[in-house]
Amino acid sequence: MAFSTTALRRTLTTSALTAAIAVSPLLTAIAQAVTLNGAGATFPAPLYEKYISEFQKKNPDIKVNYQAIGSGGGIRQTIAGIIDFGGSDAAMTDSDIAKVSKGILLVPTAGGAVAVVYNLPGVSSLKLSQKSLAEIFAGRLAKWNDPKIAADNPGVNLPDQPIKTAVRADGSGTTFIFTNALSSMNSYFKGRVGVGTAPKWTTNPLKGRGNPGVAAQVKRTPYSIGYVEFAYAKKNGLQAAAIENKKGEFVLPSLETANKALSTVKFPDNFRVFEGNPSDGYPIVGLTWLLVYKQYDADKKAAMKKWINWVLTDGQELNDDLDYTRIPADTAQKAIAAFDAEVK
């Protein structure tokens, strides 16, 4: 029996409608999916990777990407407006914020220690006074058996070898934390090198891109010394020096000693803190921020709100496991309230 043309058309139309109805939930899901692209600091990258993995399990309609390119790169891309959020361990300055027409809210996410890592064959434990550490990176102390370093390490057979410093090749919030601490500790370093994300080093140093790059330089170079976020020191099995704090105690980096150092931090309304040489605990610590615009389209704003709220609540539960300090609960709630009030 042959179908009439009209019947055939009716059948095809019905089939097409049925197919459209069947796939419409998929199309709706695709239409509702939002991607948030971020870039910046390597200091919190291990933590942000974990954040993203856990966040997306609970929010499959939001895809978050984060490129660890360094704080300097994160700030530049934020100013250029080519990402949805940035990451930096150096709080943006007023002059940088003024370059962003959409405005910027700094959201603190974690704190942590910057470890001073070293590769000294035959030396399993190293102490460095604030003066010795600062003068090594300012170029004033050139050999490992310098009397000042020897005085920090009685009974240790220090090698008669040149000190090879390793620093960041890129603009870096980790470098900001490190140079801010050393400048607070020592006036010679402050005048010679100063505070910055990409200072002019005077030691002709080895250079590595990102925390992984500096860790790799130290790991493969005997008689070298560098600085990396504590998680990278642990991950790469690097030895960390005990650094003198204001109390005269030599302290190793750890979650406990970083928490002790950051426990007295007071967050102002703009959440920008520059902790130089804390009075207790491990003396080289800092915070890291998400750089959030104050204007988004409706879908991105809704996705950013979910992301920020999660990072400052459920996400904080992950900080301890990766040796990052948590943001105080009251400060986290203030940051959430600031997002709600200021982001349009």
Regions found by a protein language model. Give the residues of each.
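Hydrophobic alpha-helical segments with strong N-terminal bias
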Residues: 9-12, 273
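N-terminal secretory signal peptides that target proteins for export/translocation
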Residues: 1-10
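C-terminal segment of classical bacterial N-terminal signal peptides
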Residues: 13-15, 19-31
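Flexible loop/hinge segments at secondary-structure junctions
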Residues: 32-344
